[in-house]
């Protein structure tokens, strides 16, 4: 794109009252999964971040515009190895996401070459504008309804597996336990996540969890926001630590306990803002949620959703799971 074309595109947006692509977008990515795209205008350039199904929110490689079309690029590195496993060459494959806008909706196409150099993939998908965040709620004025116990300590009544993976969940001595056993010499077996049959809007949630060494799980609020549950005791703070909103919000302090000890969560979700108290320490204080996290059931932040706990990684234990809905 020439400087003249870029200037013309910028002028066109200015004449229309600003660039309509700027903001946050809930994506329904190829295959029906949940994604997110955030576009910003910085001083002299555009920037963006993207979530593509699972994993973390990551920066894109570039964002640029040509008239009424937005182009977002991502780069994937592919290592070429010889028979001994030594890396002989690293290729960078660029994926282009091309977007057209109509009101509050995006029509997108992703284009990328195959890693073997033969052919081009072209897949269409959609996005919907996420409305601006409301003001930070005054939690002192929020009213909660009666508490409901989600786990009865006896069986899995009120819960069900997500998808068709194997079930590692059971109840042992009043504890909700996940044991994703892998048999030596056999192919890896995929285990499922467990969700409530009921769905919720905003709420306060309290529970206890106990981790073993290296354990990794997560608590999904409304099925879309993951509160990280992981063995991170003694690790430097980042947005993947115990109690973080996965890849989005870093705890303000480390409050996790060593493995083997019961740990408490007190989580409040109101008006797309979240507060997390871990082991009595407020580590996230009424912070905004810009969009879903990796592993979300869908990208829509306004749809009621279940509580779900992650069981597809490692073993984990939960107990005393209690929810109080917000009364509007």
What are these regions (language model features)?
Residues 15-328:
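Carbohydrate-interacting regions of secretory-pathway proteins
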Residues 10-14:
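Sec/Tat signal peptide C-region and signal peptidase I cleavage site
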């Amino acid at each position: 794109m020439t400087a003249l074309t870029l200037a013309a595109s910028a002028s066109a947006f200015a004449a229309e009252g600003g660039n309509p692509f700027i903001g946050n977008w809930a994506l329904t990515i190829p295959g029906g999964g949940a994604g997110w795209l955030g576009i910003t205008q910085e001083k002299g350039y555009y920037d963006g971040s993207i979530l593509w199904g699972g994993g973390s929110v990551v920066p894109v490689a570039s964002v640029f515009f040509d008239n009424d079309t937005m182009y977002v690029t991502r780069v994937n590195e592919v290592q070429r190895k010889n028979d001994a496993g030594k890396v002989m060459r690293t290729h960078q494959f660029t994926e282009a996401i091309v977007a057209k806008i109509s009101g509050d909706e995006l029509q997108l196409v992703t284009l990328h070459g195959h890693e073997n150099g033969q052919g081009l993939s072209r897949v269409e998908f959609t996005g919907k504008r996420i409305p601006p965040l409301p003001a930070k709620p005054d939690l002192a004025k929020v009213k909660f309804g009666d508490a409901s116990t989600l786990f009865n300590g006896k069986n899995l009544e009120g819960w069900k597996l997500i998808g068709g993976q194997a079930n590692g969940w059971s109840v042992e001595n009043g504890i909700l336990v996940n044991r994703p056993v892998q048999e030596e010499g056999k192919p890896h077996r995929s285990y499922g996540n467990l969700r409530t049959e009921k769905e919720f809007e905003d709420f306060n949630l309290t529970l206890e969890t106990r981790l073993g060494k290296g354990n990794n799980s997560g608590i999904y609020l409304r099925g879309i926001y993951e509160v990280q549950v992981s063995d991170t005791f003694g690790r430097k703070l980042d947005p993947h630590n115990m109690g973080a909103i996965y890849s989005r919000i870093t705890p303000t302090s480390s409050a996790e306990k060593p493995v083997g000890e019961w740990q408490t969560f007190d989580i409040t979700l109101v008006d797309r803002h979240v507060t997390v108290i871990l082991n009595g320490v407020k580590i996230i204080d009424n912070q905004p949620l810009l969009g879903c996290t990796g592993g979300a059931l869908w990208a829509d932040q306004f749809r009621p959703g279940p509580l779900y706990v992650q069981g597809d990684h490692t073993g984990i234990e939960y107990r005393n799971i209690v929810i109080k809905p917000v009364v509007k």
